[in-house]
Amino acid sequence: MPYLTPDGDGWQYVMQEKDIVYGLGEMPRGLNKRGWHYETNNTDESEHGENRLSYYAAHNFLLISPADGSGCIGIFIDFPGKVSYDIGYTRHDTLRFATAEPNYALYLITAPAAAEVAKEFRQLIGPSYIPPKWAFGLAQSRFGYKTEADIREVAAQYKANDLPLDMICMDIDYMQSYADFTVDKARFPDLASLPPT
């Protein structure tokens, strides 16, 4: 594969001295990912900081912008599990990545400019979901709304104080024993009725 060479259980790319590497979605350490190592593994970390290897979301797309202006390179690893990246951390001139298992699809996109690489990537994965208008509005969110009555009281207080409110975000308290895709019917007997009337 041009640009990439096999390296044990992964691949490597030799970077120029001033190449910039973008991508990986919700990751620490600024826009240029060079000089650190990362994992994309969808972990729910309670403490976010510069030294974390992984955050909540995994976006296995890198965009390399070569310093010499020779054109940009996009690398997309289509894999649902853990991917490890060493982006100039061990060796400043080497980007290396490896998946936890061998069943993945690897895509390499080249174009003269970053915008063209991004366009090709979007064509590959499909258009982004566009949220409803209310999702861009004002939200009240916290952990600890224990019942439907709590939610209704928050909405009533916003209304009584003439404050704008487009949504109330609940954490895991509505779940039955904190199990995904469940609702505790004792505390939230009519969850569907909670949207404002």
Which residues does each PLM region occupy?
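Aromatic-lined carbohydrate-binding/catalytic grooves of carbohydrate-active enzymes
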Residues: Y129-T197
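Catalytic and substrate-binding clefts that recognize carbohydrates or anionic sugar/phosphate headgroups
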Residues: M1-K133, R142-F143, E148, A155-A160
